[in-house]
From Swiss-Prot:
It comes from Yersinia enterocolitica serotype O:8 / biotype 1B (strain NCTC 13174 / 8081). Keywords: Lyase, Menaquinone biosynthesis. One of its GO terms (biological process) is menaquinone biosynthetic process. Catalyzes a proton abstraction reaction that results in 2,5-elimination of pyruvate from 2-succinyl-5-enolpyruvyl-6-hydroxy-3-cyclohexene-1-carboxylate (SEPHCHC) and the formation of 2-succinyl-6-hydroxy-2,4-cyclohexadiene-1-carboxylate (SHCHC). This is 2-succinyl-6-hydroxy-2,4-cyclohexadiene-1-carboxylate synthase. One of its GO terms (molecular function) is 2-succinyl-6-hydroxy-2,4-cyclohexadiene-1-carboxylate synthase activity. Its EC number is 4.2.99.20. Gene3D superfamilies: alpha/beta hydrolase.
Amino acid sequence: MTLACCKLDPHPQSPARQHTGPWLVWLHGLLGSGQDWLPVAELCGDYPSLLIDLPGHGNSVALTTTGFEDISRQISETLQANGIREYWLAGYSLGGRIAMYHACYGHKVGLQGLLVEGGNLGLESDELRKARFEQDCQWAQRFRHEPLPQVLADWYQQDVFADLDSQQREQLVAVRANNHGPAVADMLEATSLGHQPWLLPALQCLSVPYTYLCGERDHKFQQVAHQYKLPLRTLARAGHNAHRANPGAFAALVLSFLSQSSFLPLSSFLPPSR
């Protein structure tokens, strides 16, 4: 199954126009869509970009997934269907968790590196995972049965969004109210932290470069990054959704990471054409 997506060509003057990659592949958070990444992707225009709509979101609203292994496979099939052989994978929040899982356990041929924004590494015990799944199921029931603006008003009161002021919360509620509640609920349950493996050991064994991006006001994930010695890059004037709050600074950090991370394009290993 392939996911809905949007392709962005590199700038006309970009060297990337001369060959087939690498691409930047962007995964959004819960309640978002691939278009959330558009301001950042356009600022990273030396690279072609693929903005994916995850199951239950955007133009993939009618698609479902059974969990992390399944959605990793869907991403691989989407890349193949779009002719993408080399790529950097970037994800925010839920998208970051999916990106980490894919890099650790998925079919990652062609993966050049990983960029994670505010992604949770998982929970270390069965007890914690069980409690989190129960909590996510409660939210899912609300998304299924209550008016979406009412649920979203409570959703954005969670601690991870503490940096938002009332006007910013109202703006997010208005933007996200175009989601389909039951589809969001299905995705929330399928990708609950209660179902996610503890990813730190596998991350530490990655054979590709990776970085962890975080807004300076996102205290929860700043702490995660410091506690587990993740390769942290901090964005000024931003909280949990740093790429939305400060797309220019976010794009600059992405481009800095790409330029500092050496890689050999797949074409280097292919025989010359005759």
